[in-house]
Design a protein with these regions (language model features):
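Short catalytic/metal-binding and nucleic-acid-binding patches
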Residues: 1-148
Length: 148
C-alpha cells in the first residue's frame, strides 16, 4: 500500500499498525518523547476504548497490535492519538533542550508545506500500515517481531 493511501479498518478486527515519523527522523531516542507516547496510549486506553495487545516504540516508528472496544472506532482513536502526540512532541522539541531542534522543525515544516491538513508541521507519515490479524500464527509472528 502506498504512503497516504486510505485503509479500510474494520470495526470488529484487531490490527498490526506501524506509525512512522516523517523522513524517518529518530525522535524517540529522547525519553521525554517516548513518555509522551506512553501517556497518550494510556489516555486512549482509558478514554477512547483502545485495547493494546503488544507495542514497541522504536527510534522513528511505533509498532502495535490493537483494537478498540465499542462504541469507539480504531481509525478515529488512532487519528486522535496521532494528532495529539504530534502537537505534544513538537511542543517538547520547541520548548525543551534538544540539540537537533532547528533541523527537525525544518524537516517537519517542509513536510507540511504541500499538505492542506498540516498548517505548520507534519510529524507523522500518512497512514498506519494497518494489517488485519487474520490467524493465530500471524498474531504470534507479529508479537515476536515487535518484542524481539
Amino acid at each position: 500500500m502506498q504512503q497516504g493511501q486510505k485503509q479500510n479498518i474494520k470495526t470488529d478486527k484487531s490490527y498490526y499498525l506501524t506509525l512512522t515519523i516523517v523522513n524517518w527522523i529518530d525522535v524517540f531516542t529522547r525519553k521525554n518523547h517516548r513518555d509522551a507516547i506512553i501517556e497518550s496510549l494510556k489516555y486512549c486506553q482509558k478514554e477512547k476504548g483502545l485495547v493494546i495487545f503488544a507495542y514497541c516504540i522504536m527510534s522513528n516508528h511505533i509498532h502495535m497490535i490493537v483494537n478498540t472496544n465499542e462504541p469507539f472506532l480504531l481509525k478515529d482513536t488512532i487519528r486522535d492519538f496521532k494528532k495529539f502526540t504530534s502537537k505534544k512532541i513538537v511542543e517538547q522539541i520547541q520548548n525543551e533542550p534538544e540539540s537537533r531542534r532547528e533541523w527537525m522543525l525544518k524537516l517537519f515544516e517542509e513536510e507540511a508545506e504541500p499538505s492542506k491538513r498540516h498548517k505548520y508541521y507534519k510529524f507523522w507519515q500518512e497512514g498506519n500500515h494497518a494489517i488485519e490479524l487474520f490467524s493465530e500464527n500471524f498474531v504470534w509472528d507479529k508479537i515476536n517481531y515487535i518484542h524481539n
